[in-house]
Amino acid sequence: MTPYSALALQMDCSAINALPDRGSVDDAISKTLDHVDKSIAGSKAFISTFSGDTLKLVVLPEYFLTSFPMGESIAEWRTKACIEMDGAEYQRMGEIAKTRGVYL
């Protein structure tokens, strides 16, 4: 087995609770995924430069896309913040993983 590095990516989780509608939530999630992509690219370059290892595994924080429910009912949270397994968010994460050559 070829050695590789893993990264526990630490980042702020932007809460979406106060956002007014699903469109605003989708915009916030998109910005978070932009940040994830840039962070992985930078981390991969740093790890390669200073250790010579290849970054292959990136672990993201729990609730990194939305933060957590704060008083919302299950139905409210489902409508406001949940993502679909075949939705744009997972597709984007797949694209990031493929482009960066990592597993998320």
Each model region followed by its residue ranges:
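Hydrophobic structural segments
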Residues: 1-104
